[in-house]
Regions:
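N-terminal alpha-helical scaffolding segments that mark the starts
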Residues: 1-55
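"A position-specific structural signal for the A-helix of alpha-solenoid helical repeats
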Residues: 5-9, 44, 76, 83, ...
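Short coil/turn linking the two alpha-helices of tandem helical-hairpin repeats
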Residues: 14-15, 85, 115, 135, ...
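Alpha-helical repeat scaffolds
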Residues: 20-29, 55-66, 87-97, 119-128, ...
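Flexible helix-coil transition and linker loops at the boundaries of alpha-helical arrays
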Residues: 29-36, 68, 129-137, 165-172, ...
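Extended alpha-helical scaffold segments
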Residues: 177, 185-192, 207
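Core solenoid repeat modules with strong leucine/isoleucine-rich periodicity
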Residues: 194, 198-201, 208, 218-253
Length: 253
């Protein structure tokens, strides 16, 4: 039963970063349990597989452990189904799951991927309005995702579904390159190129100055920003500037 003790010790730690180790211990614990029904070990195994992006394996682990684990892991199952592109099945799993904050997050992601942008935006808006119930840093992620859903609605010609206050970038949208970029995309869809240019510049400046991204990550994030800058410059008649921006993208490839 040493592996079960190791698992309990692992779970007591405030943060588990080594997901391979968590998987190894949990897997051993499920095999060493005399009943073969240690629900904590099975649950830990599923979570570790999700953290390692092994979504098909997570689904197999849930199915193999029986109904008791499946009832406990409805949210994890829905997320794995979503990540493997099984959107209808993911929605069905969420309908059964309790409407926890985590379930709402997954529901919004499923709606976005299924191109139900109005529904996704509604969920993100509700979560944002109750941001005090969430985790530290969650509010910024919600704002990023809400603006992305809003931009998709604008591109689809459904801008009337976006509240007017979300069409006017505020201080919060200027604090992260992702929010500035998504706000810029909304402006592009509405044909407000001058405001889009300002937001894209802010997004690029923030991305280039970010201390959280490595050089390669910055290059990846900057490509769509600069491509949109080139497009905006063209729409504003600044053709030389557009050509220079296009050259930047080509040189970085």
């Amino acid at each position: 039963m040493a592996e079960l003790g190791a698992l309990n010790s692992l779970l007591r730690s405030s943060s588990i970063e080594d997901h391979e180790e968590a998987l190894r211990i949990a897997d051993a614990a499920t095999k060493s349990s005399r009943s073969g029904d240690d629900i904590t070990a099975h649950h830990t195994k599923v979570v570790a597989l999700l953290k390692l992006d092994r979504f098909d394996d997570a689904l197999r682990a849930i199915a193999a452990a029986g109904n008791r684990l499946e009832d406990l892991c409805l949210l994890e199952k829905a997320y794995a189904l979503y990540k493997t592109g099984q959107l209808s099945e993911a929605e069905a799993a969420l309908d059964i799951a309790a409407k926890s904050r985590g379930a709402r997050h997954v529901a919004a992601q499923i709606a976005y991927r299924a191109e139900k942008f109005d529904h996704a935006a509604t969920i993100y808006r509700e979560l944002l309005n109750a941001a005090d119930e969430g985790l530290v840093g969650e509010e910024n992620d919600l704002r990023i995702n809400l603006l992305a859903a809003d931009a998709q609605l604008e591109w689809a010609g459904d801008g009337h579904r976006v509240p007017s206050n979300e069409k006017q970038p505020g201080r919060e949208e200027m604090e992260a390159f992702e929010t500035a970029y998504n706000a810029a995309c909304g402006c592009l869809a509405r044909g407000d190129f001058a405001k889009a240019a300002m937001l894209l510049k802010r997004s690029r400046d923030l991305c280039e100055a970010s201390e959280d991204l490595g050089d390669e990550e910055k290059k990846t994030e900057l490509v769509p920003i600069i491509v949109q800058q080139a497009y905006v410059s063209t729409k504003l008649g600044k053709l030389e500037e557009a050509a220079a921006l296009q050259n930047v993208v080509v040189l970085d490839e």
